[in-house]
């Protein structure tokens, strides 16, 4: 089968995409690792913000941060390491940064997207979709996807509620970049 130069380049670029991880604790029990691939080829600023918040190499980030809002059959939202309740957070670029583009879609389980409070208000809050959420396309910047640990996301989802309040704390006990 012939593969064009463009297709080869695309495959090579995708192999070089950064991968980051969260080790998840629910209540007092370690529940496993989520591995996420970041689309630095399409949304480099958004992907770099998330990567740097996973590594903590700017002196702040997701370590010990909670998922403050979990709605089954919708999403798990976290990333407010400032206030922990969904009202705070900051990016590596300062407080907020602009929507980079909306090329990637909320096409199903495991999609990683930026939470915001309107256009161009990205900080550190993000969510992991647990279903297709196409009504969010064009409003929230998708920047990656879960590539391993889907079962851990399902465990997180199971302690959520319709209101988003979690039955037990869901915490990122460790995080970083896989190299």
Curated annotation (Swiss-Prot):
<dbReference type="InterPro" id="IPR029000">
    <property type="entry name" value="Cyclophilin-like_dom_sf"/>
</dbReference>
<dbReference type="InterPro" id="IPR020892">
    <property type="entry name" value="Cyclophilin-type_PPIase_CS"/>
</dbReference>
<feature type="domain" description="PPIase cyclophilin-type">
    <location>
        <begin position="21"/>
        <end position="177"/>
    </location>
</feature>
<comment type="similarity">
    <text>Belongs to the cyclophilin-type PPIase family. PPIase E subfamily.</text>
</comment>
<keyword id="KW-0697">Rotamase</keyword>
<dbReference type="GO" id="GO:0006457">
    <property type="term" value="P:protein folding"/>
</dbReference>
<comment type="function">
    <text>PPIases accelerate the folding of proteins. It catalyzes the cis-trans isomerization of proline imidic peptide bonds in oligopeptides.</text>
</comment>
<dbReference type="GO" id="GO:0003755">
    <property type="term" value="F:peptidyl-prolyl cis-trans isomerase activity"/>
</dbReference>
<keyword id="KW-0413">Isomerase</keyword>
<protein>
    <recommendedName>
        <fullName>Peptidyl-prolyl cis-trans isomerase E</fullName>
        <ecNumber>5.2.1.8</ecNumber>
    </recommendedName>
</protein>
<dbReference type="GO" id="GO:0005739">
    <property type="term" value="C:mitochondrion"/>
</dbReference>
<dbReference type="InterPro" id="IPR002130">
    <property type="entry name" value="Cyclophilin-type_PPIase_dom"/>
</dbReference>
<dbReference type="InterPro" id="IPR024936">
    <property type="entry name" value="Cyclophilin-type_PPIase"/>
</dbReference>
<dbReference type="GO" id="GO:0016018">
    <property type="term" value="F:cyclosporin A binding"/>
</dbReference>
<dbReference type="Pfam" id="PF00160">
    <property type="entry name" value="Pro_isomerase"/>
</dbReference>
<keyword id="KW-0963">Cytoplasm</keyword>
């Amino acid at each position: 089968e012939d593969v064009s130069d463009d297709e080869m380049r695309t495959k090579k670029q995708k192999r070089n995409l950064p991968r980051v991880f969260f080790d998840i604790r629910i209540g007092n029990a370690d529940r496993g690792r989520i591995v996420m691939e970041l689309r630095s080829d399409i949304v480099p600023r958004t992907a770099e913000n998330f990567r740097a918040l996973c590594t903590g190499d700017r002196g702040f980030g997701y370590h010990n941060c909670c998922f403050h809002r979990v709605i089954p059959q919708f999403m798990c939202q976290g990333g407010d390491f400032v206030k922990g309740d969904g009202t705070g957070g900051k990016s590596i670029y300062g407080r907020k940064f602009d929507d980079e583009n909306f090329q990637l879609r909320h096409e199903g389980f495991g999609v990683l997207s930026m939470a915001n409070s309107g256009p161009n208000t990205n900080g550190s809050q993000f969510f992991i979709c647990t279903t297709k959420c196409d009504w969010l396309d064009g409003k929230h910047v998708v920047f990656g996807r879960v590539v391993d640990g889907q079962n851990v996301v399902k465990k997180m989802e199971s302690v959520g509620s319709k209101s988003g309040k979690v039955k037990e704390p869901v915490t990122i006990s460790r995080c970083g970049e896989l190299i």
